[in-house]
Amino acid sequence: MRFTKMHGLGNDYIYVNCFEETVENPSEVAKKVSDRHFGIGSDGLVLIMPSERADFKMRMFNSDGSEAEMCGNAIRCVGKYVFDRGMTNKNVIRVETLAGIKVLELTVQDGKAKLVKVDMGEPILKPENIPVNSDKEIFRTEPVEIDGKEFKVTCVSMGNPHAVSYVKNVDIFPLEKIGPKMEHHPLFPKRINAEFVEVIDRTTLKMRVWERGAGETLACGTGACAVLVASVLNGVSERKATVKLLGGDLIIEWNENNNHVYMTGPAVKVFEGEVDLNEL
């Protein structure tokens, strides 16, 4: 199987061009190739496929083999992959995901895609659609107890579910302890991605993320979008802000006119290779 390793802010995936390759049982393949000791090493596997509804289709699998609806960092790399390889010459690309069709706008330098702006669509705030076990109109600054400590949580879906809470110092926050307990909290029937945020100022937010099925990662694009939306709802941020993640910065904007959230950030190719899956 031929592959390309790429990352968006250190959120790294193995990309396979399914116009040329067939991947049987992608869930198992994801587990094998993601292993950082016995495989290639990544946060998951992304398949780039033909689509009947858009220019391309993306399927993505976490390192534990579970299929995810959408990943902002991964989809930016899909945009770079198809443009740099000449699979399209368009600067605006439509990509089908399990969370709907996403529109990508590429900034091209020297014939290569450098920055990708993604229309992430409208945030979902109704608890039943996130899903959260709550009959509230929106789940904003609601108390969630973990280990006897109360967190004020705001929930947003960007095609996948997020629980956002605020902390004084995100660098020393015990994420590896609290993150998995938030992910598996009974309030969240499909588990949840947990973001912990420090507000630097009204246009700068600093976050760490515990991703459902992957643990702490260097960056999560949908998580950064959810953080911006939650921060606007909570009155602590402007509608456009820089979100600082461990792997780097994303610029997130929640447009007032069309209610869409836009994410702009880099996409980087690391290397290409070939792997015999029977040997893993």
From Swiss-Prot:
Q: PANTHER family recorded for this chain?
A: DIAMINOPIMELATE EPIMERASE, DIAMINOPIMELATE EPIMERASE, CHLOROPLASTIC
Q: Which residues form the signal peptide?
A: none
Residues binding substrate are: 11, 62, 72-73, 160, 193, 211-212, 221-222
Root EC class: isomerase
Q: Where in the cell is it found?
A: Cytoplasm
**Cellular component GO terms, alphabetically?**
cytosol
Tell me the PROSITE patterns matching this sequence.
DAP_EPIMERASE
A single GO molecular-function term is: diaminopimelate epimerase activity
Q: Which SUPFAM superfamilies match?
A: Diaminopimelate epimerase-like
What keywords does the record list, in alphabetical order? Amino-acid biosynthesis, Cytoplasm, Isomerase, Lysine biosynthesis
Give a short account of what the protein does.
Catalyzes the stereoinversion of LL-2,6-diaminopimelate (L,L-DAP) to meso-diaminopimelate (meso-DAP), a precursor of L-lysine and an essential component of the bacterial peptidoglycan.
Q: Does the keyword Cytoplasm apply?
A: yes
* Matching Pfam families: DAP_epimerase (PF01678)
Give a yes or no for keyword Isomerase in this entry. Answer: yes
Q: Name one GO biological process term.
A: lysine biosynthetic process via diaminopimelate
Q: List site positions: Could be important to modulate the pK values of the two catalytic cysteine residues.
A: 162, 211
The protein's Enzyme Commission number: 5.1.1.7
Organism of this sequence: Acetivibrio thermocellus (strain ATCC 27405 / DSM 1237 / JCM 9322 / NBRC 103400 / NCIMB 10682 / NRRL B-4536 / VPI 7372) (Clostridium thermocellum)
| Gene from which the chain derives | dapF
InterPro entries xref list: DAP_epimerase_AS, DAP_epimerase_DapF
Instruction: Please give the subunit comment from the record.
Output: Homodimer.
- Active-site feature positions: 71, 220
Name listed for the protein in its UniProt record: Diaminopimelate epimerase
